[in-house]
Each structure stands twice: as structure tokens, then as C-alpha cells.
Curated annotation (Swiss-Prot):
Belongs to the tRNA(Ile)-lysidine synthase family. The keyword Glycosyltransferase does not apply. The N-terminal region contains the highly conserved SGGXDS motif, predicted to be a P-loop motif involved in ATP binding. GO terms for biological process: tRNA modification. GO terms for molecular function: ATP binding; tRNA(Ile)-lysidine synthase activity. Keywords: ATP-binding, Cytoplasm, Ligase, Nucleotide-binding, tRNA processing. The lineage of its organism: Bacteria, Bacillati, Mycoplasmatota, Mycoplasmoidales, Mycoplasmoidaceae. One of its GO terms (cellular component) is cytoplasm. It is found in: Cytoplasm. It holds the Pfam family ATP_bind_3. This is tRNA(Ile)-lysidine synthase. Transmembrane segments: none annotated. It catalyses: cytidine(34) in tRNA(Ile2) + L-lysine + ATP = lysidine(34) in tRNA(Ile2) + AMP + diphosphate + H(+). InterPro entries: Rossmann-like_a/b/a_fold, TilS/TtcA_N, tRNA_Ile_lys_synt, tRNA_Ile_lys_synt_N. It comes from Mycoplasmoides gallisepticum (strain R(low / passage 15 / clone 2)) (Mycoplasma gallisepticum).
Length: 287
């Protein structure tokens, strides 16, 4: 991740403390800010105005996507909202000719994600959030993963920077919110101990994880190489995560059965997305 003063980044800004902090710290390097108003809660317009006021004051170009209140979400809201969000980042990046995006995930987000993954009994080689990832052609950077939420709030309060609070973050509807509530009851030392547990797991699996990433750098989509690998499940997890497809061990086992049968040519991964066999080659296709 470059840290020059060149205006090279797109940034996602919700109006909450994390993204406002990130915007304030990187404002000189921001080419365009993106805000999505899902119109799902009474304070949505307030957050939009917080973002637009900050960008106007600091002369930062801003693109706003306002989702119709009547928009029908046909599946998990958070999953669909994420797709809407990142598709908007992608199209805005193309418009402004920028392919690097800043996201305000911090140390608490890392820990919450790691706990969610661990609680699902997913035997992963990496828990938490990556400093760098990608969404299609867009490079994603998370420069706040070394900061706790409390540190972000202290900065904003000290500098009297306005931000909004998303009240849906406190609803027990979502598993992440339940984990967040439980973590809020811990001391800083206890939270750090939980974090250290996952960092140690990641360190222990570092060599194996690198070998899984290296596999894809030379893989020619021959599915025999995939199913014959001792890291089959981890390979599939990484491949799916890069293509925004949910992974489960049961799905991986069903795919293994599909690949071992000669007659079947396609496997449904999610609505409109299939795994297609063409000879010994394998690809993910939207139909």
C-alpha cells in the first residue's frame, strides 16, 4: 500500500466513526469518496449529510448511491448490502480511473470476524481480515487493522470531528453484533488475549497458507489438481472467497462428489452462479 500524497484512493465512507476517522487521516490521498444510503433506518439521511458536509468542507469529490426504500432484499441483508456496496465502489473506481479502495475495518472488526469463523468450526489457515484483498479488479486496503475502536473514538472526540452512530450495530439480530456485545464486556487485556490466540494460529499456519496462495498462481484450472491436493478444502475456501461465494465444508464435500462423477457438468454455487466442468477444466460461471 502506497503512502504518497498522490490522490490515488477511493474510500468507502458510511458516516460512522471508523470511516470518518479513515477519511480524515487519508484525505490528502483521496480521489473520490463513496457513500451508500440504504434507506433502512431513520438516521440514514443524517449519516449521508455528515459525509457530504465533511467532503464539501475538505473539497473531496463524493459519489452517493441512494438505494430505494422499496428495494426488495431477497436474501441476507448484510450479504446483499455488501454486494451493492462493492459493486458501487467498483463502478465509481472505473469512472474516476482509480483501482485502490480504502476500507475502515479495525482491530475489533478483525477479532469479531475471527471469532465468527472459529465458532462455525471452520478449520481455516487464516482467521480475521486481510490487510489487503481484492474485489474483481479493485484492490482493497484496510490500514486501520492495527487500531482498536477505542483509539479511533478518542481521536475523533479530541479533534471534535462529527460522526454518526448506526443503531443497527446494537441489534441482536446479527451474529456479529452478539459477538461485539460480548467483547464489550471484556477488559482490554482480555480482548488482547483473544486476539493473540488468533494471531498465533495464523502464524502457525503461515507456511501452509502461502502454499495455498501459490497454488493459484500456477493453476491452469485442472480440477484433478484441486481434488488430489491435501489442501483441497483450504484451496476451495480461498477460491470461493475471491469470487464472493459462501463456503461450507458440506458444500466442499458435495463439490468433491460432483467432480468425481463423469456425467455431471455443472454445480450450482448460488443463484445464477455455477461451477462448470469442461473436460478436466473447471470454472465459475454466471448464467
Amino acid at each position: 500500500m502506497s503512502t504518497t500524497n498522490k490522490k490515488q484512493y477511493l474510500i468507502g465512507v458510511s458516516g460512522g466513526p471508523d470511516s470518518i476517522y479513515l477519511l480524515d487521516r487519508y484525505q490528502d490521498q483521496i480521489k473520490v469518496a463513496c457513500h451508500i444510503n440504504y434507506n433502512k433506518r431513520p438516521t440514514a439521511l443524517r449519516d449521508q449529510l455528515i459525509v457530504s458536509d465533511y467532503c464539501l468542507k475538505n473539497k473531496i469529490p463524493l459519489e452517493i448511491l441512494s438505494v430505494s426504500p422499496s428495494y426488495q432484499y431477497h436474501k441476507n441483508f448484510q450479504d446483499q448490502a455488501r454486494k451493492i456496496r462493492y459493486d458501487f465502489f467498483l463502478s465509481t473506481g472505473l469512472k474516476y480511473q482509480v483501482d485502490q479502495c480504502l476500507i475502515a475495518h479495525h482491530k475489533d472488526d478483525f477479532l469479531e470476524t475471527a471469532i465468527m469463523q472459529y465458532d462455525k468450526n471452520q478449520e481455516l489457515l487464516f482467521y480475521g481480515l486481510h490487510q489487503e484483498s481484492s474485489y474483481q479488479s479493485l484492490k482493497i486496503f484496510r490500514p486501520l487493522l492495527n487500531l482498536w475502536k477505542d483509539e479511533i473514538l478518542s481521536y475523533l472526540e479530541q479533534d471534535k470531528i462529527v460522526y454518526g452512530v448506526d443503531e443497527s450495530n446494537f441489534l441482536s439480530t446479527y451474529q456479529r453484533n452478539k459477538i461485539r456485545t460480548n467483547l464489550s464486556k471484556l477488559s482490554q487485556e482480555q480482548k488482547q488475549a483473544r486476539l493473540d490466540f488468533f494471531l498465533e494460529l495464523n502464524k502457525k499456519n503461515q507456511v501452509r497458507y502461502q502454499s495455498v496462495k501459490d497454488f493459484f498462481s500456477s493453476w491452469d484450472c485442472n480440477y484433478l489438481d484441486l481434488i488430489n491436493s491435501l489442501e483441497y478444502y483450504n484451496l476451495l475456501y480461498l477460491w470461493f472467497s475471491k469470487n464472493n461465494i459462501k463456503y461450507s465444508k458440506q458444500k466442499a464435500e458435495n463439490i468433491l462428489s460432483f467432480l468425481q462423477k463423469k456425467n455431471n457438468k455443472r454445480f450450482r454455487l448460488k443463484a445464477g452462479v455455477y461451477l462448470i466442468k469442461e473436460g478436466i477444466k473447471l470454472k465459475i460461471v454466471k448464467l
